[in-house]
């Protein structure tokens, strides 16, 4: 599975709300020897793949042209809507 990701320049609650309103959601990639990277992912592309078992094993994120292999570490969902609020990915 491969997803396109964009590095986030704005941080905070307001920036995250603007992302969600635009059909994206914030996420972070951490682990390994590299520094953590805040990214934004397309909500519809990710939510449609989350019901597949392969999603939780290994994912390739294309972050500014570089391919990073990750695994979902944590998913924060909306309380009653079928929406993802935030995701944590760990490098593998």
Swiss-Prot record:
Q: Please give an example of a GO cellular component term from this record.
A: cytosolic large ribosomal subunit
**Encoding gene, per UniProt annotation:** rplY
Q: Which NCBIfam families match?
A: PRK05943.1
Quaternary state and interactors? Part of the 50S ribosomal subunit; part of the 5S rRNA/L5/L18/L25 subcomplex. Contacts the 5S rRNA. Binds to the 5S rRNA independently of L5 and L18.
> Could you identify this protein by its name?
Large ribosomal subunit protein bL25
Task: For this UniProt record, give its keywords in alphabetical order, as a comma-separated list.
Answer: Ribonucleoprotein, Ribosomal protein, RNA-binding, rRNA-binding
Q: What organism does this protein naturally occur in?
A: Aliivibrio fischeri (strain MJ11)
Which is an annotated GO molecular function term of this record?
structural constituent of ribosome
Keyword Amino-acid biosynthesis in record: no
| Presence of keyword Transmembrane | no
Q: Which HAMAP family match?
A: Ribosomal_bL25
Its family remark reads:
Belongs to the bacterial ribosomal protein bL25 family.
Question: Can you list the disulfide-bonded cysteine pairs?
Answer: none
Which Pfam families does UniProt cross-reference here?
A: Ribosomal_L25p (PF01386)
CDD domains the UniProt entry points to: Ribosomal_L25_TL5_CTC (cd00495)
Please list the GO biological process terms of this entry. Answer: translation
Q: Which residues cross the membrane?
A: none
Query: What role is this protein assigned?
Result: This is one of the proteins that binds to the 5S RNA in the ribosome where it forms part of the central protuberance.
């Amino acid at each position: 599975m491969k997803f396109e990701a964009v590095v986030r320049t704005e941080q905070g609650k307001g920036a995250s709300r603007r992302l969600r309103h635009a059909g994206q959601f914030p996420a972070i990639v951490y682990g390994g020897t590299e520094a953590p990277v805040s990214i934004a992912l397309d909500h519809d592309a990710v939510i449609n793949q989350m019901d597949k078992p392969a999603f939780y094993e290994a994912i390739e994120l294309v972050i500014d042209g570089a391919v990073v292999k990750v695994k979902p570490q944590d998913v924060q969902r909306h309380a009653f809507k079928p929406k993802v609020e935030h995701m944590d990915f760990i490098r593998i």
